[in-house]
């Protein structure tokens, strides 16, 4: 159900109608595989993917600029997340589809199902990456069969079947010194097949946003921005500081 603090179902229906009158579409953004510490119904020990060693769960965070390890909270516990075991993915996907089927939504925005693939290396019921891939593909198909449009972030090849939009598509190459030239191979393959865009322009750390915009146009990507209804300053001293420019 829609949280009462967010306006409930009626306000969601009103928002969808307002966006439709402007010619837009409303997508429900959902993360199935990266479960944050603030989740109330998640059983961490049972449902989190594990390493080979007993007691080690797949828990990550944001990149620490000092150590470059992607396990830091940087002072905000909501930055920490667990990787859901592929074993439990069908359970959560089916529950989500069942609970949202009656809402007036144009589609679903899959925050991590299109760019996150991982194994579960627990000693019993081990699930390797190939098995995880089959599970993810089956759930992507189930979401596509729901009749809603599908948007994915990142857009790995296995996630593109039945997808209408791709956001956060790669617009740059690696920063390795050995790389001489950048070729937009990803965009060359997708162009004309699905709509795609890169990172929101107003959240990119850059001293030349105009060049970033022109690069998107050159690569055939739609310019993208992220906006918030309230003052962005309300997100100061929070894990959402990456959205401070919205």
Segments the model singles out, each with a brief description of its role:
Residues 32-40, 46-106, 112-246:
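Active-site-proximal substrate-binding groove within the catalytic cores of carbohydrate-active enzymes
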Residues 1-37, 41, 131-141:
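Aromatic- and glycine-enriched glycan-recognition loops and surfaces
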């Amino acid at each position: 159900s829609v949280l009462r603090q967010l306006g409930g179902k009626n306000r969601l229906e009103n928002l969808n109608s307002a966006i439709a009158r402007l010619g837009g579409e409303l997508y429900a953004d959902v993360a199935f595989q990266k479960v944050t510490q603030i989740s109330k119904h998640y059983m961490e020990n049972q449902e989190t993917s594990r390493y080979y060693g007993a007691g080690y769960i797949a828990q990550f965070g944001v990149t620490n600029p000092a150590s470059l390890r992607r396990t830091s909270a940087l002072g905000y516990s909501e930055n920490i997340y667990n990787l859901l075991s592929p074993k439990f993915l069908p359970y959560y996907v089916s529950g989500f589809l069942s609970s949202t089927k009656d809402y007036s939504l144009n589609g679903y925005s899959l925050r991590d199902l299109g760019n996150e693939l991982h194994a579960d290396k627990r000693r019993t019921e081990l699930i390797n990456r190939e098995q995880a891939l089959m599970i993810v593909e089956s759930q992507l198909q189930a979401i596509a069969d729901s009749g809603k449009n599908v948007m994915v972030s990142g857009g790995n090849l296995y996630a593109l079947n039945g997808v209408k939009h791709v956001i956060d598509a790669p617009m740059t190459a690696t920063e390795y010194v050995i790389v001489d030239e950048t070729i937009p191979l990803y965009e060359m393959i997708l162009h004309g097949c699905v709509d795609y865009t890169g990172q929101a322009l107003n959240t990119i750390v850059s001293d030349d946003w105009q060049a970033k915009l022109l690069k998107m146009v050159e690569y055939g990507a739609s310019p993208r921005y992220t906006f918030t209804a309230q003052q962005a300053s309300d997100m100061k001293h929070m894990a959402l500081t990456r959205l401070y420019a919205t």
